[in-house]
Amino acid sequence: MAGYPTNGSVYVSNLPLGTDENMLADYFGTIGLLKRDKRTGTPKVWLYRDKETDEPKGDATVTYEDPHAALAAVEWFNNKDFHGNTIGVFMAESKNKNAGDAVEFVEFDGGAEETNGGAGRGRGQADSSAKPWQQDGDWMCPNTSCTNVNFAFRGVCNRCGTARPAGASGGSMGAGRGRGRGGGADGGAPGKQPSGAPTGLFGPNDWACPMCGNVNWAKRLKCNICNTNKPGQNEGGVRGGRGGGYKELDEQELEETKRRRREAEEDDGEMYDEFGNLKKKYRVKTNQADTRPAVAAGRAGWEVEELGIDKDGRERSRDRQRDRGRDHHYDKDRRRSRSRERERGKERDYDYDHDRDRDRDYGRERGSRYRN
């Protein structure tokens, strides 16, 4: 049953008095993500209780999201101390293979004989989940998302690179039930773990994932369940980039950047931002200053700009007033010339009429003289 589990449920026996669902969820949740009830949202942990007294009977079932996590729980938690009692942890078996989720959790009378392969009657047969090419000493990767079976000579998993745990052995994976082919290294020692098994599951430097609560080994920089970064670790340092991205800058580099910025400002007299770009307002004022003569020192740039604007405005107003004065004098002179021309015309008409009358009188006098 250890190679490819069909479900993610494990059966736990010999629990001490006072055990509740939260204690089991905290303990078994350290190796994998527990499945949650869709209605209540709580981890799927079931304590068997007496029908009459409603007291816990000392056994329970725990369901994982990943069946391989359940397999790892059997490997790590079986025959371990839990609040003073040595508990038994076994894979759950379906009562009916076609019944879907209907699972019967079987209590084993002989401790771990049924799982580890005790001396049975008959020829026996190798576990159906065991690989035919497996040999004594082969070991399974402890990474619950990998569970690759590696040859005995490998020190790390050839699929995910996880280090081989101390005392890991795959002998139980080839164990048969009874005598016969497939009898593994643990076949004659029912209820016992390999001699080199680690005494504890996690060390003091192992860390719990802040997202899913999974406990990871100290060497991991990411959670092996949800890929969340280890607390205190990030991929690129401080987000100091212009777009909020990662940008690693040490103190020496910052000082060098400031020094170069000061040198650039002293060379061309312009202001730069922290990224080395010319500031916009100083860029505009520099262009305006190029088109105007220099102003007396000691005034700020904006004061120079405002004075220049006021000066130009006053000059324009003077020009407009001067133009208006010229137009006024021109109109006045034109009106005067017109009045003079009219007066001269009147004088000419008067002189012409006077001369004509005088000639007429002279003609009359001559005519009367000749008649007499």
UniProtKB/Swiss-Prot annotation:
SUPFAM superfamilies: Ran binding protein zinc finger-like, RNA-binding domain, RBD. PROSITE patterns: RRM, ZF_RANBP2_1, ZF_RANBP2_2. Residues 8-94 form the RRM domain. Belongs to the TAF15 family. Residues 245-264, 308-372 have a biased composition (Basic and acidic residues). Component of the TFIID complex. TFIID is composed of TATA binding protein (TBP) and a number of TBP-associated factors (TAFs) whose MWs range from 14-217 kDa. Interacts with TAF4, TAF4B and TAF12B. Keywords: Activator, Coiled coil, Metal-binding, Nucleus, Repeat, RNA-binding, Transcription, Transcription regulation, Zinc, Zinc-finger. Pfam families: RRM_1, Zn_ribbon_RanBP. Residues 168-190, 234-244 have a biased composition (Gly residues). It comes from the Eukaryota. It is found in: Nucleus. GO terms for cellular component: nucleus. A zinc finger (RanBP2-type) spans 135-166, 203-232. This is Transcription initiation factor TFIID subunit 15. Residues 111-136, 166-199, 229-272, 285-372 are annotated as: Disordered. TAFs are components of the transcription factor IID (TFIID) complex that is essential for mediating regulation of RNA polymerase transcription. One of its GO terms (molecular function) is zinc ion binding. Expressed in roots, leaves and inflorescences. Its main location: nucleus.
